[in-house]
Amino acid sequence: MISLAWQKRAIPLYWKILTHKGANNLTEQKAVIRPVIRLLKGQKIIITAHREFHSIFLSHWLKKYQKLDVYFVFRQKKSTMIKRGKKYCNLSELKVNVGETKLLLNQKITKILKVKTYNLLVYKRPHGLTCKLNGRYSNHLRQ
């Protein structure tokens, strides 16, 4: 389901009923997102999603829509690999103090060669690490 966040309310815009249990795949995610991008064409869109939408392939696909003012912010698993210097490490290996936020710009995410760079916001909660991947959205956070 895709909803419009408006004045602390969520207004459903588009949804699909899945015939299977468990996580949806990239094809199903695109099938739900694409009509909403068309519907809101010309509007600035920021897609936020729960961890089921953490796919680097979905992020790669959505980056193509940046010229249409479509941005995204996705939570990432602690096991997500990022490139730090010449080596890769898990997000869980980053040195972040509880309550601290780090903005890592232009990060190579995963070891997949065709994937571009992303901005990554890392925040350590008392009970874990929250990581958000985005398509250049952090530039808008500073405004």
What spans do the regions from the language model cover?
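Active-site cores of enzymes that catalyze phosphoryl transfer or operate on phosphate-rich substrates
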Residues: M1-L4
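Single, function-defining residue in the core of a domain
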Residues: W6-Q143
